[in-house]
Curated annotation (Swiss-Prot):
Protein topology in the membrane: Multi-pass membrane protein
UniProt-listed Pfam families: IspA (PF04279)
Name of the featured protein: Membrane-spanning protein YciB
Lineage: Bacteria, Pseudomonadati, Pseudomonadota, Gammaproteobacteria, Enterobacterales
Similarity comment: Belongs to the YciB family.
Coiled-coil region(s): none
Annotated gene: yciB
Its biological purpose: Plays a role in cell envelope biogenesis, maintenance of cell envelope integrity and membrane homeostasis.
Transmembrane segments: 22-42, 52-72, 76-96, 121-141, 151-171
Amino acid sequence: MKFLLNSIPTISFFIFYKFYDIFIASFSLMIASLFTFIITSILFNSINKHDLINLIFVIVFGFLTLFYHNSSYIKWKVTIIYFLISIVFLINYLFIKNNLLNIIFKNTIQLSKNVWRKLSLFWSIFFLICAVSNTYIILYFSEQTWVTFKIFGLTILTLIAVIINGFYIYFLKSKIIQ
């Protein structure tokens, strides 16, 4: 259910972009993100830090987009977020003993520290690739192509990364059982 609620801002952005323009779409993204944040906080009786950080980025970059009437801000938001996530996973991989992924999934998946480290490196590289890809699309393609890439391309890339992780974990778990 949370996944569906969190999809509302993206769907809203896409629909308003198709019928209006990036500025109306950015405003709808801001409103839908705030609405979704409030609803999920009430339904799940807690404030998710990830959702709060995302909301702050959406509001700040959405406001800048509207205030300066410049779509670059909303486009670069994606690159900045993915780059920061990549850095967090890289720092976690290199310097921190308590692996971030292990902390997140500690009640769900039991893996060795070495495997958690490899997964952190994988996600660091993945988010860096997404940041670089978004930058490339911003610089060399039309706004419409960027919107399509943001909505569908990055979603598909993320789904592929999750599937790869799932197969990797399944392979490791089945190897341990045998």
